[in-house]
């Protein structure tokens, strides 16, 4: 997942690489921007409106937001924002697929908002620009006070980015009996790659997530068995 960021150190193939060498370039000018804001946080209402006004009126972009954001009573009651609100494109999580039409994601909130934005894209993720307006900000390096300048820099191209890996999660049910040899390890303690690829069963859920996965026992009284491979 490409995330726009402030200068800092990253590793690449065993050596320290200057992040300044990783840059975002546009093959064509971006047209569609997804704005994700932290829900049920009234302090983000004004920053959200400021950003949308800027993107629509000054940058002349198509702005996508969640339908539940537009349906917010505080937003709908603002008559001065109604003209902008009518130009916003809305979508519903789990119903509308916007994965192929978004050029850039802008997040307003904390790390949780960024993780949520990542979950909306189960394939390739557009570049993400995250403004720190939440409780945690390890993944949100931009300050909103200078949002116009920062957004302009991104649209001009050559902005610094960091590529973040995501985890692929599969829930498999109805597993067939696995051959005992699949449980053996090599001399160095590494489980052979075909241990997983040879497993058979019905995949009931598959997700790509950023940072972490929580395995919950659900209605069961205990978690019977966990196989973890790295």
Located regions from the model:
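Short glycine/serine/threonine-rich phosphate/pyrophosphate-binding segments
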Residues: 44-45, 112-118
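Short beta-strand segments
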Residues: 36, 107-109, 116, 130-131, ...
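Short glycine-rich anion-binding loops that position phosphate/pyrophosphate groups of nucleotides
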Residues: 39-40, 111-113, 136
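ATP/NTP phosphate-donor binding region
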Residues: 1-108, 144-162, 171-179, 188-190, ...
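Glycine- and small hydrophobic-enriched segments that form the cores of compact globular domains
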Residues: 96-106, 114-116, 126-127, 131
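Catalytic core of DAGKc-family lipid kinases
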Residues: 135-230
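Short, solvent-exposed amphipathic alpha-helical segments in soluble enzyme
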Residues: 49-54, 122-123, 229
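Short, acidic/small-residue loops that bind anionic groups at enzyme active sites
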Residues: 121-143
